Amino acid sequence: MVDQVKVVADEQAPTEQSLRRNLTNRHIQLIAIGGAIGTGLFMGSGKTISLAGPSIIFVYMIIGFMLFFVMRAMGELLLSNLEYKSFSDFAADLLGPWAGYFTGWTYWFCWVVTGMADVVAITAYAQFWFPGLSDWVASLAVILLLLGLNLATVKMFGEMEFWFAMIKIVAIVALIVVGLVMVLMHFQSPTGVEASFAHLWNDGGWFPKGISGFFAGFQIAVFAFVGIELVGTTAAETKDPEKSLPRAINSIPIRIIMFYVFALIVIMSVTPWSSVVPSKSPFVELFVLVGLPAAGLINFVVLTSAASSANSGVFSTSRMLFGLAQDGQAPKMFAKLSKRAVPAKGLTFSCMCLLGGVVMLMVNPSVIAAFTMITTVSAILFMFVWTIILCSYLAYRRKRPQLHEQSKYKMPLGKLMCWVCMAFFVFVLVLLTLEADTREALMVTPLWFVLLGAGWLFAGKKRLAK
């Protein structure tokens, strides 16, 4: 299965089954950062602040803490066997072919749905500069651009993600710096409110909405971390993975503190949490207070953030299809690479699915309600993927203790933290039953596994036998 796949270095001529290690440490670090900073931070943080107040800071820290251990488990597994292309490979190897099948296709589905949402968002943001541009023309242009750039080389994907992530970083650092200056200079808003760190505890304390508000924050905040595992799909195309992957994963806590915690502290220090409008971006509102041309600036940042997410989706779905096809769990055509060592057919198929979904949304706006539920289902399914990573780690510790002993990148508190993280995911699922919209999505989620199960029984096993 996995050992049949050979990953060659850049200077070697690729074969039909080889991926090139063209992603450098610089690419991997920024891909990891880009994966950890979603569009939700820019657009959804207003809602999370209004739900939980200052306690939202602890919510992001707790989720980030848990996911750091998921990423450490993934890192140790990927480095235990450099033949692994992604987490679906080690799931198949350690838990059985069914696990690779369910993980690979679930991850593919998650990113296709997320990609559709991103493309629709990009077309909406593009209206800011091109108000007369037709939605379907804009969508087609975006998808063709992403396809064209990804078909070029894996290095092109790395370069795009590098600059997309850099834009997000600059925007967040600018917000933190501007906010700090406003606090230090005792900036006063037009309504007479003075910027101060005291807003964090003076306006009802750290938990103004009580424990229920604190818990409500988890329901939305956990979705902001979707994509944090993306670096795991680059393993087969990373130069010097033994150095690059640990470096990228180890910096996750610093990134979360800087990009989530510091940004939220600054936002709630300049504007008291009770004055934050849920439907508006707190980032935009802060820049508006200073008098900067925030509308165009933030529109550009959020557009590139959505483009980064869509780009990541196109990349990861094609690599998942490639791995599944290599293992006999997807059509053989997806196992073929182009002359540039890119899974071109997988890329084209994923982009066709993106385009089909976007066209359906635009032709029939009534589908949007169902689509909103599907995106929530997709976010829930990401938690399934994270859980499979943890289950794979437990199987690895049980079946291959010698590899763990030899590992230079051991997961801290390995077995214990696997169970703690899985208990946390169960806790989040219980919280999702408390709200009507997320409860409906949770009830629909088993349908995906029924479909996958049918596919496994009728097609997956047969391909595997061949």
Question: What name fits each language-model region?
Answer:
Residues 83-84, 106-121, 225-238, 293-332, ...:
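Membrane-helix boundary/coupling elements in multi-pass transport proteins
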Residues 4-12, 89-92, 119-139, 171-174, ...:
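Helix-loop-helix connectors at the membrane interface of multi-pass transporters/channels
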Residues 1-46, 50-55, 68-72, 83-84, ...:
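Membrane-interface "cap" regions at the ends of multi-pass membrane proteins
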Residues 123, 136-195, 226, 249-253, ...:
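Membrane-interface loop-to-helix entry segments
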Residues 164, 333-344, 383-436:
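C-terminal membrane-solvent junction of multi-pass transporters and transport-like membrane proteins
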